[in-house]
Structures are given as structure tokens and as C-alpha cells.
Amino acid sequence: MISSEEKAKIKEEIVDKVNSCLEKNGESFRMDKVTVLNREETVKFMGSYRVYDRRKYGAVSREINSFLKKYGDVEIKSKKIRDSGMKFTTVSFNFEL
């Protein structure tokens, strides 16, 4: 099982990296937190972010996905959203350690 300090470090690392990538690409959305689900044998980390400029989605997702893969097998899902005239792509991810 991963210690509380390690969990906190991983959560902070992910939020910092995702927000840095979004800011670098001129995106207004910022990730607040990563959720942790403690299981009997493993710990599951889950989060999501948005990309508003669909032309930048490829570059943003490639950079973030390559960073997340350092934690192992990552499940990543994306969905295009149109809400009250706003268009964006929401990306959710999760992995277990």
C-alpha cells in the first residue's frame, strides 16, 4: 500500500503537470484535484480536465497522457461536449498503483 505522503505527492504532481500543460497551451480550465480511492490491495487515482480549443486538443492530450503513463497502465477517455453554446473536450483518466 502507498503511504499518505506518496499519495499526496502523486496528486500534487499530476495537478501541477496538467495545469502547466493547459496554461502553456492557452487553456482557461485548471484542474483542482485528483481523487484517490483506497482499495484493499491498490490505490486508484482519478481525475479529469477540459480542453476548450479543439485544435489544441491533440498536443495537450499527448503531453498529459505521456506524463500519466509513467504511472503504468492508464485508462483515458475523452468526450466532446456542447453545453449552452460552449464546446469543449473533457478527458478523464484513472490508474491504479
Predicted regions and their residues:
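Short glycine-rich, basic-tinged beta-strand/loop micro-motifs
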Residues: E27-R55
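Short, non-transmembrane amphipathic alpha-helical segments
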Residues: G58-I76
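Short amphipathic alpha-helical segments
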Residues: E6, I10, I14, Y52-I64
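C-terminal edge-of-domain segments
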Residues: S78-L97
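N-proximal, solvent-exposed amphipathic alpha-helical segments enriched in charged/polar residues
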Residues: M1-D32
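Short amphipathic beta-strand and strand-loop transition segments with alternating hydrophobic
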Residues: M31-V36, E75-R82
